[in-house]
């Protein structure tokens, strides 16, 4: 009986080791782990696996977002190990975000064997399909010598090949879970069925790279560029070489309108202030002359830009996406092309017959920037002023993660022009305020580049225990908390009464973050004016680790400034 138990534990461990080895052969570099007993075969295998960088955290929700950040920054799949029960369910928000933005996360969940599900066994829930349509599913049986290792590996390979969204691999392990020794000598005959696999570094089942692309033919491009057009840059990653859009804009002679998530929002060759320019009568009249639009990416932030695209009767509407999906809530009649933005830009585009038709947009864009310099940079201390200062100081070697709700909208509206911008990250698939600290930690950990996270106070409270992840960062990670004491984005929405806004939407809390930073041993500073913020920010960028800067502002400062700037630009 003891030998049987030992064999069970060792076979569990062998399967766990085979799984992790195969993941490394599919490009997995990072493994995020939470403690638990039912995932012991995977945990022990991970401890012995020297090809993976291991990241440990006590909270599975934060762990999932850490993996998301690592995958975003590395442009490679990241694996997550959890035990059974609600530990798996806590990954759900991160998996939703990853699915909507095509980030490959691989969940390895330990589970009870099937005979212990639905019978009152401890920490046992129905884990199969727990992520619904947000993840592909592979349900592994309990380890069994009658199931050859080649069956296990080929099943893994079929799911892992060409992975562009989350994959849930559910691993059922019977007890005992802890082997007396970590040797696989007794399985030599079993493993011999793998042949040369043990002496190579490639997957057991090699699947061809499935690259789905559909580019416009030359004659279609000739017809498309014949007229007045605009180019719109939506959400783009650095891997899509978004700077090629600048070259295309210059070649066609069409203006490039940029979103906060395009990596081009601050580029001097683009019309970055499009959200505010659409308020200006002269700019809007000029833009209304456009007949054709070429959109790269989707998930636009600016409601004004979204409305502009939706309301016009376009002669031709083209959209370029790296994946086949619908990214247009207005459901416009259009032609969808598939491919990387940079690859489509590199095609032999002819020059437009109406090149430079909207050249005056450049001077209008610069005029808006001068307004921002005068009214925001030279005005009262506030959230937009801080965001502009951060964005203006960044270099191409740095990274900027912008939190949801008000911060990302302030960046989209007011970011400065003419700067060498940092690599920009957001979580705008589901646009939640959860997991932002953890995701930024993942981005910072992979690259080791100086990283700034800008987020609101409610977002920071939502993910406060992820400061434990920040504590382990070895490169500068500056967490800037814009504390306006509640959800003040609701100041911009038509809530019927101020009493309702205060009691049911804004949720003032009266908290400050110094004690939270102290709890996790992080350097902390508080800024109530621009001079104090600049001093604190420069010091934080020189600190070899994470630090917290709290910016305290009045509840209505940002919303009032947004309204004042809108009135000013309308009247110009």
Swiss-Prot record:
Pfam families reported in the protein's UniProt record: TPP_enzyme_C (PF02775), TPP_enzyme_M_2 (PF16582), TPP_enzyme_N (PF02776)
Keywords in alphabetical order: Magnesium, Manganese, Menaquinone biosynthesis, Metal-binding, Thiamine pyrophosphate, Transferase
Cofactor note: Binds 1 thiamine pyrophosphate per subunit.
Catalysed reaction equations from the record: isochorismate + 2-oxoglutarate + H(+) = 5-enolpyruvoyl-6-hydroxy-2-succinyl-cyclohex-3-ene-1-carboxylate + CO2
UniProt keyword Metal-binding present: yes
Named cofactor requirement(s): Mg(2+); Mn(2+); thiamine diphosphate
Pathway: Quinol/quinone metabolism; 1,4-dihydroxy-2-naphthoate biosynthesis; 1,4-dihydroxy-2-naphthoate from chorismate: step 2/7; Quinol/quinone metabolism; menaquinone biosynthesis
Keyword Metal-binding: yes
GO molecular function terms listed in the Swiss-Prot or TrEMBL record: 2-succinyl-5-enolpyruvyl-6-hydroxy-3-cyclohexene-1-carboxylic-acid synthase activity; magnesium ion binding; manganese ion binding; thiamine pyrophosphate binding
Name assigned to this protein: 2-succinyl-5-enolpyruvyl-6-hydroxy-3-cyclohexene-1-carboxylate synthase
Subunit structure: Homodimer.
Disulfide bond sites: none
Primary gene name: menD
NCBIfam families: menD
Source species, domain of life: Bacteria
Organism annotation: Shewanella amazonensis (strain ATCC BAA-1098 / SB2B)
GO biological process: menaquinone biosynthetic process
PANTHER family in alphabetical order: 2-SUCCINYL-5-ENOLPYRUVYL-6-HYDROXY-3-CYCLOHEXENE-1-CARBOXYLATE SYNTHASE, PROTEIN PHYLLO, CHLOROPLASTIC
């Amino acid at each position: 009986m003891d030998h049987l138990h030992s064999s069970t534990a060792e076979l569990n461990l062998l399967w766990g080791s085979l799984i992790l080895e195969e993941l490394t052969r599919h490009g997995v570099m990072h493994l995020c782990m939470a403690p638990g007993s039912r995932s012991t075969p995977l945990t022990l295998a991970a401890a012995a696996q020297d090809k993976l960088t291991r990241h440990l955290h006590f909270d599975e929700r934060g762990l999932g977002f850490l993996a998301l950040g690592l995958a975003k920054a590395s442009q490679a799949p990241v694996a997550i190990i959890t035990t059974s029960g609600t530990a798996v369910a806590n990954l759900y928000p991160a998996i939703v975000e990853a699915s909507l933005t095509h980030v490959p996360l691989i969940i390895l969940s330990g589970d009870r064997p099937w005979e212990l599900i639905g019978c009152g066994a401890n920490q046992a829930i129905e884990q199969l399909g727990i992520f619904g349509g947000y993840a592909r599913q592979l349900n592994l049986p309990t380890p069994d010598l009658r199931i050859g290792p080649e069956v296990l590996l080929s099943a893994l390979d079929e799911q892992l090949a060409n992975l562009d969204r989350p994959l849930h691999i559910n691993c059922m392990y019977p007890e005992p879970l802890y082997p007396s020794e970590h040797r696989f000598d007794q399985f030599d005959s079993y493993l011999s069925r793998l042949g040369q696999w043990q002496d190579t570094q490639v997957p057991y089942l090699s699947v061809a790279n499935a690259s789905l692309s559909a580019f416009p033919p030359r004659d279609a491009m000739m017809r498309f560029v014949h007229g007045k057009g605009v180019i719109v840059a939506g959400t783009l990653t650095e891997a899509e070489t978004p700077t090629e859009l600048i070259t295309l804009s210059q070649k066609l002679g069409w203006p490039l309108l940029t979103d906060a998530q395009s990596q081009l929002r601050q580029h001097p060759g683009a019309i970055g202030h499009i959200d505010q320019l659409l308020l200006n009568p002269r700019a809007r009249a000029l833009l209304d002359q456009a007949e054709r639009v070429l959109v790269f990416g989707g998930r636009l932030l600016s409601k004004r830009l979204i409305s502009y695209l939706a309301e016009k009767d376009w002669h031709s509407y083209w959209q370029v996406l790296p994946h086949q999906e619908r990214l247009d809530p207005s459901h416009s009649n259009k032609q969808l092309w598939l491919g990387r933005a940079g690859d489509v830009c590199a095609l032999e585009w002819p020059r437009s017959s109406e090149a430079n038709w909207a050249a005056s947009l450049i001077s209008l864009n610069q005029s808006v920037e001068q307004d921002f310099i005068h009214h925001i940079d030279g005005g009262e201390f506030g959230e937009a002023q801080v965001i502009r200062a951060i964005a203006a100081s960044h270099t191409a070697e740095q990274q900027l993660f912008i939190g949801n709700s008000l911060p990302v909208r302030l960046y989209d509206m007011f970011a400065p022009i003419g700067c060498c911008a940092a690599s920009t990250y957001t979580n705008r698939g589901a646009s939640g305020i959860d997991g932002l600290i953890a995701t930024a930690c993942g981005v910072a950990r992979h690259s080791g580049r100086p990283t700034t996270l800008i987020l609101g106070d409610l977002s920071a409270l939502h993910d406060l225990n992820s400061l434990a992840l920040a504590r382990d960062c070895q490169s500068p990670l500056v967490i800037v908390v814009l504390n306006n004491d509640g959800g003040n984005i609701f100041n911009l929405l038509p809530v019927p009464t101020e009493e309702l806004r205060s009691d049911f939407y804004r949720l003032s809390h009266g908290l400050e973050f110094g004690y939270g930073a102290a709890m996790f041993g992080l350097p902390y500073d508080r800024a109530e004016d621009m001079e104090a913020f600049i001093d604190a920010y420069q010091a934080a960028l020189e600190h070899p680790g994470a630090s917290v800067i709290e910016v305290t502002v009045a509840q209505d400062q940002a919303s009032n400034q947004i309204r004042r700037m809108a009135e000013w630009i309308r009247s110009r």
